[in-house]
Amino acid sequence: FGDSNTYGYRPDGTGRFDEKTRWTCLLQKNFGNGHRIIEEGLCGRTTIFSDAFREGRRGLDQIGITIETHNPIDLLVLMLGTNDCKTRFNASSKTIAKGLIQVIEKAKNYSSQPFELLIISPIHLGNGVGDDGFDPEFDLASEQVSRQLAQEYRKVATHYHAGFLDASKIALPSEIDREHLDESGHAALADAIYKTITESGLLLSLIHISEPTRLDVIS
């Protein structure tokens, strides 16, 4: 459950990466046919902030019905926060983390069974992302807040005994738009998420078995 970097938005603005490129699809390939990855990426999605210019981007409004649509799930992967750094929201990293907590709590309330949780702190916004010719919705303060998210998200993960991954340690934003993952970033992130899930013990009882099982993972 994420934003444009889960959707697979291309940095050059020409649409969406194909299923051979998106990290969600590569993760599906890593897990194989015995497991099912559910893609829930939406461009512009935030944790709790309503965007007056783009309808339906508030993750808190969508997570409940999304969980109900796909119940039962075994693992929820959350990667949100980049759009919360936009200047019009004027949010600190602590505020964004509090928004993430609200999303998690609502997901728990709407789930038909307990699920494991993996929190991913998103890649950093690139230097100069708000410069002329790039994305005017961000500025230098946005860049700084994006760099502070990992510290706050790690605290949230610890509170929920959840898995945690700092995507900024794995990939950089494309130089084309200073905001979105490129092909190599998607590949690196898919491998890192797979490793985190398998090596941290998330879904361990379902992954290390001799017969395939249905594994629903909302990403």
State each model region's role.
Residues I207-S219:
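Single conserved hydrophobic/aromatic residue that forms the stacking wall/gate
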Residues T47-F49, E175-I176:
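Short Asp/Glu-rich motifs
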Residues F1-L42, I48-F53, T66-H70, L76, ...:
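Serine-esterase "nucleophile elbow" of acetyl-processing enzymes
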Residues L42, L203-L206, S210:
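Short, flexible loop/turn segments with low-complexity composition
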Residues C25, N33, R57-L204:
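Alpha-helical cap/lid subdomain in secreted, periplasmic
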Residues T6, T47, T82, T213-R214:
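Ser/Thr-centric signal marking residues that sit
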Residues R10, H161, D216-V217:
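Short intrinsically disordered, low-complexity segments
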